[in-house]
Amino acid sequence: MERVDVAIVGGGPAGASAAHAAATGGADALVLEKGVPRADRDRLGPDSTDAAGILDYWVDIMGIHPDEFDDGVVQRELNRAEFRGPDEAATLTSTGIESSYDGFGYTFQRARFDDWLRDRAEDAGAEYRTGVSVRGVDTDLSVDPSDGPNGDAGPDGRGDPRHVVELASGESVGADFVVLADGPQRTVTNRVLDEYLPADAAASERLASRTANHIAYQEYRRVPEDVYEAVNDALVFWWGVMPGETAYPWIFPNDDRVCRIGLTMPIGLDIDEFDRDAYALLDPDDESIPQGGEYIRRLLEWQYGDEYDVEDDFPLVEDAGKRNGTETYPISSTRPIDSPTDAGVAVVGGAMGTTSAFHEGGDHVAVRTGAIAGELAAAGDMAPYNRRWKEAIGDEIVRNVTMADMVADYEPADWNRIIGAADAMLAAETGDGLLAQPYRSGWESVKLLLGYKWNKRRVMKDYVGIDESEYVY
């Protein structure tokens, strides 16, 4: 049986960062990635799907400055985010949070970003293996790696592993620590966590994909010159134009007049629960929630159809994305979870639920949680992980959870109201730096600001979906 210090299930930003940190710390680290083909990558790699944008202070959370990336990773430098409602609009030009990055943020090419993280891990000494599917993880809790060789020591002097990672090929990999980085689908994570949770509180039920995730869809389209000029340095979000909790479309700019035009929404919505006439992207005769591609077509027709032939003037870039210029993927819309660290297991990134349903940002916290887990695995003690990730990203998670909770039941009229009083809302979401004049938008702004602060205090006390105290060993 192959033997390593730390086995990492999944090779996205969290998994590759865990491998880099573990190898940098002197551990023998192995990434096991099933591998996904993409039109914009010439080798198998992780899924590499998201809206791919980073705000200024996320640079410091992630711990990687964009100057470190290879050419072509960063696509556009940003100076603002635009929030558009059915009839109102607001623009955010500063997050108000201190950062080592001078701009507002940047967009990036996700496959190149993931490839850079992979190369960095391999350069540090980790092995990154693709085309490998993990069936499960068997754990012997009686084995403590800190005890040194135990049982029958192998030729490398190491004893029995605490974990045996079973591969679909029938092969096995022994490891002292396991980092679960298999993303929001949690194909392996849920099965592993179920071993440490009561049957009536199983992770496979609480973190089931249809209830714990949103579905996202985006297209890579080359847009007309004047449209690109208007959005090439901005993130654009529309709120209150499609039904569902934290459901919204967006435009994120790439290079060469290419924009990623996408959306996210809950899974399994019933259109009969919504007023079709209230939403700009629904038609009165819709019999079901539109598919992602139809939503994008309607968005473009609504915004640009008076001036352009959308299909001719906004063509798909077929050599981009996963396939034919499009991609569909899940994003976590649940609260983050603690890990069963007494078993030498850490859950990181999307698998632990750090992605924000409010703005889909998640790569920065994936990199950071993976790096913490890899560092601790190399040190031989995973026990501090749950405390460490909260210290590193807790404030960010609380902001995201608070805003998602506050807008969960909003309808189009609510979005018009909140965007119309955006001074307080945007200030509250991004930090105290924008609160110099919190009341200038009137009573509506006061209500929003006070509501945010009250909800934030409530969320701070309970923002973890599965607490470490729930695990049974």
Across the structure, where does each feature detected by a protein language model lie?
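N-terminal Rossmann-like FAD-binding beta1-loop-alpha1 element of flavoenzymes
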Residues: E2-V31
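Core beta-strand elements of the Rossmann-like FAD/NAD(P) dinucleotide-binding domain
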Residues: E2-V4, A168-F177, T341-G344
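N-terminal FAD cofactor-binding segment of flavoenzymes
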Residues: A21, G25-A27, V36-E88
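An active-site-proximal "capping" alpha-helix that borders the catalytic cofactor pocket
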Residues: I8, A18, G362-N386
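Predominantly flavin-linked oxidoreductase catalytic cores and closely associated redox partners
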Residues: E122-E307
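FAD/FMN-dependent oxidoreductases across multiple families
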Residues: G136, D275-T369
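C-terminal helical "tail/cap" subdomain of flavin- and related membrane-associated enzymes
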Residues: E375-Y473
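Short beta-strand to alpha-helix junction loop
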Residues: G96-D119, E287-G292
